[in-house]
């Protein structure tokens, strides 16, 4: 299990086989979260979703956008839909900014307006509002990871997982006709780049590596790898 987790880029510096055998809950949960997070965020990039070019801000370059980690791209996507809905609020985190359910209500009504209305905004009881929101998420096949209580508590991990699942299921971004090409590799070169990316992440370098060539440009990640 440890070697398999390491092979997909999880940091395993603080957990060993004995910890799993002994049932050390906090270490096991930490490893499970890394595995889930990687699976959810793996395809949130320009290569898999070239329509993400719509999220570029004024003056931002293609190279700048490539440097964004997937969680920041998700926040950008969330805010894109809030803006499109002419909503007055924006999100900068997966905790307090989503805990009252207002922004989720707008996001869902924007990505699937035929099945998700804004009725939860009329509910003043926040726990009941959270349940209404998740009922609408269920209607579009996205009631996963989050509970009313964890939404209200502003659990950042579960909220991130929920938003990632929404994006992976309903990105709701119009395709672009003239998106700049993302650098392609032959199959062998792409496999090698992926192997190096996973290996670096298994060393627990900070920040994590998502775009190998962009993230290595300043040399910081390489210096960290030498010290491991």
Locations of regions flagged by a protein language model:
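Alpha-helical coiled-coil scaffolding segments
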Residues: 1-228
């Amino acid at each position: 299990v440890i070697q398999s987790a390491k092979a997909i880029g999880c940091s395993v510096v603080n957990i060993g086989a004995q910890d799993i055998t002994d049932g050390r809950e906090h270490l096991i949960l930490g490893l499970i979260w890394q595995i889930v997070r990687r699976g959810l965020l793996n395809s949130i990039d320009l290569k898999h979703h070239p329509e993400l070019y719509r999220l570029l801000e004024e003056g931002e370059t293609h190279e700048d956008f490539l440097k964004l980690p997937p969680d920041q791209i998700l926040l950008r996507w969330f805010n894109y839909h809030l803006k499109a809905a002419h909503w007055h609020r924006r999100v900068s985190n997966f905790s307090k900014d989503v805990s009252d359910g207002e922004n989720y209500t707008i996001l869902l009504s924007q990505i699937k307006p035929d099945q998700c209305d804004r009725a939860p905004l009329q509910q003043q009881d926040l726990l009941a509002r959270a349940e209404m929101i998740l009922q609408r998420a269920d209607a579009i096949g996205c009631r996963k990871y989050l509970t009313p209580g964890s939404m209200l508590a502003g659990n950042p991990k579960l909220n991130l997982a929920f938003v990632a699942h929404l994006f992976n299921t309903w990105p709701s971004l119009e395709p672009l006709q003239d998106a700049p090409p993302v650098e392609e590799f032959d199959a062998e070169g792409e496999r090698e780049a992926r192997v190096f990316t996973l290996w670096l992440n298994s060393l627990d370098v900070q920040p994590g590596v998502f775009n190998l060539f962009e993230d290595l440009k300043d040399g910081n990640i390489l210096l960290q790898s030498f010290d491991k």
